[in-house]
Amino acid sequence: ILAWNRTYKVPYVIVRPTNNYGIGQYVEKLIPKVCKFLSIGRKIPLHNQGEPYRMWLHAKDTAKAITTIIESGKTNEIYNISGNFEQKNIDTVKKILDLYSKEFVHSKNEDILDLSIVRDGQDVRYSVDDTKLQALGWKTECNFDDELPEIVKFYKDNFIW
C-alpha cells in the first residue's frame, strides 16, 4: 500500500487492530477454541506454556475506532487500535475455565491444558501504541473481564462445532 502511494499517489488509511474478541468470532481463535475443546472434552493446547502476552480489543470497540478514523482521521496515515488491555494467554484460558463450569474449578492444569507445544518464532508479546487514535477522541468502552462471561456463555449455549 505504501509503495502504491509513493509510486502512484494512491491515498490510504491503514488500521492495525490488536486481537479482537466477541460473540461470533472465528472458531479457531483462542476464546471460542477453548470453549470448543471444553465442550468436547479435549485438552486445550497452549503454545509456549501460555506465556505469550496478547492485547485484547472487543469487536465493538474496533468498529467504533474505525468509525472514528473514517469521520476524523487523516488520509495517508496509519492508526493502531490497541484497547490497552493485555494479559498472558494462560490467564485468558484460566478465566474461561472459571466461567465455563464448576467442574473445572478443582481440576489440575495438567488434566485440562496441553502445555507441551513449543512454537518456535511465536511472538512473545506485541504491544501497539494507539495515542494517534486516542487524539481523535476514541477510547475503549468494553472491559474484557466484564464482557467475557457473556461470550463464554454464548459459546457454551450455542455449541455447534
Regions found by a protein language model. Name each.
Residues I1-V13, L38-I40:
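Active-site Tyr-X1-5-Lys
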Residues Y12-I14, P45-L46:
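Conserved active-site beta-strand element of glycosyltransferases/polysaccharide synthases
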Residues L2, P32, K94, D98:
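Active-site phosphate/pyrophosphate- and oxyanion-stabilizing loops and adjacent acidic/basic residues
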